[in-house]
Structure formats: structure tokens, C-alpha cells
Amino acid sequence: MRKSYKFIISVVQTKMKILWNLKLINNERLLQIDNCVIAANHISLFDPPFIGSVFPKEIHYLAKAELFKNKILGKIISFVNAIPIRRGTIDRNALNAVEEVLNKGDSILLFPEGTRKSNKVKAGIGKITSETGKNILPIYIQNSDHLWQCFFRKKKLMIVIGEIIDITEFQSIEDRKDKYRKIAEHTLKKIYELKNECENS
């Protein structure tokens, strides 16, 4: 991990703990994570840095291409391994970049629902994991959209680390679109099952 990257995530971690009452559940599972697709629900602009900061290794992200038009912001998010993706279309360049990241042994954070305003799963994560053979780490984040309540200790910023999803069982499905869809739906189901751990802690 680059020293500058490590400094950035340590600052984010400190802010999450002190300002927003962070509770990280199942953090011991992070030590076993290497080269996978990290899949999480998406409720806030802060989700990528919050989730990324809990990992002991650098990870990569997808960010909408419009953000890179701002030169300063573009440099910042590129520095923390963001990959631009064009929304509303099949962005082959972004998909190729994601596969390149995974094939060289790194991990990438994806949001199966695509955007914060969507509650429908996108099949993209199924395509990526099926074609690269990489497993999926589900993560559930709660209250990143209620930071003021977290600041005043009315809520906790919570991140739950799930168990690795082995996609091997899906690889025998012959219809590719059906396979991608089933992987994506199963992943989203596993993400939202982690919500129970927030409520029980």
C-alpha cells in the first residue's frame, strides 16, 4: 500500500470513528480477503471512501465519468484508484479496466444496484465475476446517509463484512444472461441479509 494512500484512509477511518460513531462488524474477515469483487448497497456519496478505508489493502472503484471532468476532483479520485464509467450505456472500456484490475490480483468495489436511487439489481456484476472467475465479498453499509444523526450519537455508521460468495455453483448455467442475472440477484440478497447483523448489534 502506498504511504499516501494509507494516510488518506487512516484519516477517513479516524473521522468515521470519532465523528460518525463507526461500528465495523466482522472486521476479522477482511484479513482473508484478496483479489475479489467487493459488492455493497449504495445509499450515499460517501459509501466508496467509507467502505474502501476499512480494507488493509488498496482497492479500486468505479466512478461516473462526469466526475473526471473536474480536473482537481478527477486527479483526486484517480489517485485513489477510481475507474471512470459512462452511465446509461455498456461501457466496454470500463469493463475491460475492471477485468484488468481483477486479473492482476487486485480487488474492486462495485454497487450491484448501480446508483443510489435504484433498487433494481444490474447484471454487470454477474458478467464480471463469471468471466474473471473471481468470488464476491458482500458488504452492507448503514446510515452513511444520516451522518448528522451519527454525529449526535442518535445513530451509528455501520459497516458489515459478509462471507465470501463462491460463484462456482453458477458457472454451469448455460444461458449467459440468465447466469449473470442469477449471480447478481444472489449477491444482492446476501448483501441485504447482512442488515440483520446491524439490528442485532
Identify the role of each PLM range:
Residues 1-20:
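Extreme N-terminal tail/first-helix region
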Residues 3-4, 93-201:
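Non-catalytic C-terminal accessory region of glycerolipid acyltransferases
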Residues 10, 17, 30-89:
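Catalytic core of membrane glycerolipid acyltransferases/transacylases, capturing the structured
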Residues 14, 28-30, 51-52, 74-75, ...:
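Short secondary-structure boundary/capping segments
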Residues 14-33, 155:
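N-terminal signal-anchor transmembrane helix
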Residues 22-24, 82, 159:
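Generic structural signal for residues in well-ordered beta-strands
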Residues 23, 87-95:
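Glycine-rich, highly charged phosphate/nucleotide-binding loops
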Residues 28, 65, 86, 140, ...:
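Residues at the C-termini of beta-strands that transition into short coil/loop
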